[in-house]
Amino acid sequence: MACTENGLAGHSHSPIIVPVDKNRSKETCHNVQLRSLSSMLKDDEDDADVWTRPPVSLRPPFNVPRTGARIPQNPRAPRHPLTLTPAIEEESLATAEINSSEGLESQSQKGHDSINMSQEFSGSPMALMIGGPRVGSRVLERSGNNSKPYIPVPRSQGFFPPRGSQSRGPPYIPTLRSGIMMEVTPGNARMANRGNMAHVSFPLGSPRHPMDNWQQSPSLPLSPSITGLPCSSAHCFLPPQAPAFNPFPVMPTAFASPLRFGPPLLPYVFHYNTGAMYPPPYLN
């Protein structure tokens, strides 16, 4: 029986051997080494050379130069340092002031129209301005579509009184109140500081002369005899019949005693006679 190597002679690593008999039938033979020791050592050296050699890349090397982490510069940006001259600074400040003033004016015009009363001088006429820019003495500071109608208001028809304290005394009109004639002298309203007092005159029958008022009053009529009164009707007074209106009643007025059974009370009787009083019937 002869065994042949399956594959290339001396280069096969397979341990399987296929024997060939006379009838050229193939049989497998295991665990049979056909290679020599020299060939095996040569294969080990080739493997060591493969592992020790550096890897060879198929592509050419692509190296990017790294100069550090930097932000790429804008090619459109100016590369020279920016320096401000005094002329540029003044121009920028003026531009900023103009922009701020225009912004404030636009904000003021967006609001609702407000009525502003202004009087520049004490002697100048009062002016009424409805919205828009400030109005001077008949001259608009700004002209154009933004200007509002200017309405001059004469002095006599102003909404507010003119400046300055103008104190006027009350008119010289005598006033009659409650039978007292009061006359106030024209002048300053502060009468207490100057010592001016109002002149008060009382008509006839005033509290200063009570006798005149008592004499002018009609005689008090006597009441007719009333049954049940303990006193006679000659000593009881009735109130007067609607006397004239007097704001200062000083004289006492006699009233009739109430209708009750018993001795009358002293405050209700102006004149009473003790001899004419009789004891009540239930005391007898």
From Swiss-Prot:
Matching Pfam families: DUF4645 (PF15488)
Range of residues in the leader sequence: none
InterPro entries in the cross-refs: DUF4645 (IPR027891)
Region (Disordered): 59-80, 97-119, 143-171
UniProt xrefs under PANTHER family: PROLINE-RICH PROTEIN 32
Annotated protein name in UniProt: Proline-rich protein 32
Protein's gene: Prr32
